[in-house]
Amino acid sequence: MLALNNYLIISAILFSIGTIGVLVRRNAIVIFMCVEMMLNAVNLTFIAFSKYLGNIDGQIFVFFVMTVAAAEAAVGLALMIAFFKNRESIDVEDVNIMKW
């Protein structure tokens, strides 16, 4: 059985990898996957504290975060598909639709 520190270290590593991926990558799909990795790292932290403290609140909150992540995935992928149909690219450098 792992201690709380081990779960928190794994979660921090996953969150750091996701943050670096968001900051370094140019492909919108890869950035999107890195954001999802960051959300899963937060979920792991909630589960670890929920288990450590012995209450179920963290696990319930994880279900809400997963629901929001699923909605984010649906909307994000729909936006990427629409952008790809218009520009035939999903690089974030090509996103200048919002410019005046």
Curated annotation (Swiss-Prot):
Where do the TM regions start and end?
4-24, 29-49, 60-80
The SS bond pairs are none
Superkingdom is Bacteria
What GO CC annotations are associated with the protein? NADH dehydrogenase complex; plasma membrane
Q: Which InterPro entries match?
A: NADH_UbQ_OxRdtase_chain4L/K, NUOK/Mnh_C1-like
Short name of one Pfam family: Oxidored_q2
Q: Which GO terms describe its molecular function?
A: NADH:ubiquinone reductase (non-electrogenic) activity; quinone binding
Query: Which Gene3D superfamilies does its entry note?
Result: 1.10.287.3510
Using the UniProt record, give the first listed, main subcellular location.
Answer: membrane
Membrane-protein topology: Multi-pass membrane protein
Q: Where in the cell is it found?
A: Cell inner membrane
Question: Can the keyword Transmembrane helix be found in this entry's annotation?
Answer: yes
UniProt entry keywords in alphabetical sequence: Cell inner membrane, Cell membrane, Membrane, NAD, Quinone, Translocase, Transmembrane, Transmembrane helix, Transport, Ubiquinone
What's the Enzyme Commission number for this chain? 7.1.1.-
Q: Which GO terms describe its biological process?
A: ATP synthesis coupled electron transport
Q: Which EC class is the enzyme in?
A: translocase
**Reaction equation(s) it catalyzes:** a quinone + NADH + 5 H(+)(in) = a quinol + NAD(+) + 4 H(+)(out)
On subunit structure and binding partners, the annotation says:
NDH-1 is composed of 14 different subunits. Subunits NuoA, H, J, K, L, M, N constitute the membrane sector of the complex.
User: What is known about what this protein does?
Assistant: NDH-1 shuttles electrons from NADH, via FMN and iron-sulfur (Fe-S) centers, to quinones in the respiratory chain. The immediate electron acceptor for the enzyme in this species is believed to be ubiquinone. Couples the redox reaction to proton translocation (for every two electrons transferred, four hydrogen ions are translocated across the cytoplasmic membrane), and thus conserves the redox energy in a proton gradient.
Record's family? Belongs to the complex I subunit 4L family.
Q: Any idea what this protein is called?
A: NADH-quinone oxidoreductase subunit K 1
Q: Name its species.
A: Geotalea daltonii (strain DSM 22248 / JCM 15807 / FRC-32)
